[in-house]
From Swiss-Prot:
Signal peptide: none annotated. It comes from the Bacteria. The keyword RNA-binding applies. This is Small ribosomal subunit protein uS17. GO terms for cellular component: cytosolic small ribosomal subunit. GO terms for biological process: translation. Keywords: Ribonucleoprotein, Ribosomal protein, RNA-binding, rRNA-binding. The keyword Zinc-finger does not apply. Belongs to the universal ribosomal protein uS17 family. HAMAP family: Ribosomal_uS17_B (MF_01345_B). The lineage of its organism: Bacteria, Bacillati, Cyanobacteriota, Cyanophyceae, Synechococcales. InterPro entries: NA-bd_OB-fold, Ribosomal_uS17, Ribosomal_uS17_bact/chlr, Ribosomal_uS17_CS.
Amino acid sequence: MAVREKIGIVVSNKMQKTVVVAVENRVAHPKYGKIVVKTKKFKAHDEENRCQEGDLVRITETRPLSRTKRWQVAEILREVKKL
């Protein structure tokens, strides 16, 4: 079975070794045809605590690590600049 991947933005890194990643999905409304942006949040494992809020990351599906965590951060695609 292929490994599922998603790309999203880190919206929270307040937990130890865990980040919340918001993934946008654009779908057409079935009746009206308007493109609607749907956002879903995934908890992902970040072993080294490298991710900051605003980073663009790729997450991959993994075995369940906790009750709500089934994804892990594969790589950071774009880091946010720190002031």
